[in-house]
Amino acid sequence: MKIILGIDPGLNTTGYGVIDVSSGKVRLLEAGVVRSQSKHLTGKVGEIYDGIREVIETFKPDIVAMEQLYTHYDRPTTAILMGHARGCICLAANQSGLDVVSYGATKVKKILTGNGRATKDQIQRAIKLELNLTTYPEPPDVADALAIALCHFYHGRLGVHVKPSELHHGIDRLFPNDISRQ
């Protein structure tokens, strides 16, 4: 694993962060957002797909790490809509021969800060420190994408090896026996 593409999926704004870890240290290559201008779902999905494909073609990552789908039971429609964003990202990755691994928000927070309930500010401080940034990463979608990419890197460094059979597109199966997982 040398280049990790972290993605925070969203229908209107999808954050991404590309890091190079080939030297054993983390180096930020690029971070940004793919903004959907379309008012229609099919247009939004197409714009996300095109934007992520462009990032993949530019940086040629070895893997895509994405935030795991989560929604409150009061808002099932949110999960369905977010599933569309995740689906087109998984398709873009698959068509480039890349595996996608997902991490829940609690797992990302715990790996980055040691606290699964860390605040956004604590996460941003951890990212700023690790990437040697002069300011906090903004907007929040970018910060989340960088946190996910860093989480995947630290996950591997902590000795948790991911078998190819556990890399299912959009499904978190890294800790199948971990009962603390969200």
Could you describe each region identified by the protein language model?
Residues 1-182:
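Phosphate- and other anionic-substrate recognition elements at nucleic-acid/protein interfaces
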